[in-house]
């Protein structure tokens, strides 16, 4: 279960609980559901697991040491539901395109991942490997995102003065990791990256995602992996809403 971020804090407050109490309850419901569906899992992953936190911090440090994380100031339209910033061009009549709600404008100092450094490489990789993102309509959508010139470097932190519920940055203890950067890493942290037996056996893997999270999986994730020197996933298989 993906357990960090602004919306978890807000939901916990509404329920009169701490974030940890809230996610423990929700995660427990998911774990209780699987046997009822006749499904047995090998390992249930939570992004609040100590092992996951340690691997996220190791990955962040690797990207930082590679010179791909810098400190800067950013102002943008932030949707709590999506837990991401939107550019003016991405908004629809000033509203979040997913939730149709007005995002908050937030101006603050944060850490950024040099995603733009890897966008030309990513576009080339997608063109050279036509089935990397499938079906074709979503491959074309990702290429359009990259080649539009609208993508900026990725803000990968939140100041503790605004949000304490997250994984602390090793290189600045006044900040926590942005939830998407943290959550995407469970694909490899669950396998014991960088040296676990399961990681060696099962990665690179296949991804199956819904169309609303195409950008994090089709743009954020492969550039993160490239920066850290981790092999890319085999394919990104995208479906509409079920």
Where in this protein do the model-derived segments appear?
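Structured secondary-structure scaffolds
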Residues: 51-55, 106-242
């Amino acid at each position: 279960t993906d357990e960090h971020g602004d919306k978890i804090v807000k939901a916990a407050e509404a329920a009169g609980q701490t974030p940890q109490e809230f996610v423990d309850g929700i995660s427990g419901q998911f774990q209780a559901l699987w046997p009822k569906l006749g499904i047995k899992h090998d390992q249930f992953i939570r992004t609040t697991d100590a092992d996951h936190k340690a691997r996220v911090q190791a990955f962040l440090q690797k990207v930082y040491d590679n010179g791909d994380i810098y400190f800067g100031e950013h102002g943008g339209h932030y949707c709590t539901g999506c837990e991401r910033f939107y550019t003016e061009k991405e908004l629809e009549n000033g509203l979040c395109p997913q939730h149709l709600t007005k995002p908050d404008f937030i101006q603050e100092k944060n850490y950024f991942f040099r995603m733009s450094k890897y966008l030309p490489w990513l576009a080339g990789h997608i063109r050279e490997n036509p089935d990397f993102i499938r079906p074709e309509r979503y491959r074309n959508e990702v290429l359009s995102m990259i080649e539009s010139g609208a993508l900026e470097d990725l803000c990968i932190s939140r100041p503790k003065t605004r949000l304490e519920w997250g994984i602390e940055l090793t290189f600045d203890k006044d900040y926590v990791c942005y939830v998407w950067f943290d959550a995407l890493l469970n694909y490899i942290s669950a396998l014991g990256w960088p040296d676990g037996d399961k990681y060696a056996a099962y990665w690179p893997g296949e991804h199956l995602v819904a169309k609303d999270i195409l950008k994090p999986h089709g743009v954020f994730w492969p550039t993160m992996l490239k920066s850290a020197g981790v092999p890319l996933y085999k394919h990104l298989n995208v479906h509409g809403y079920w």
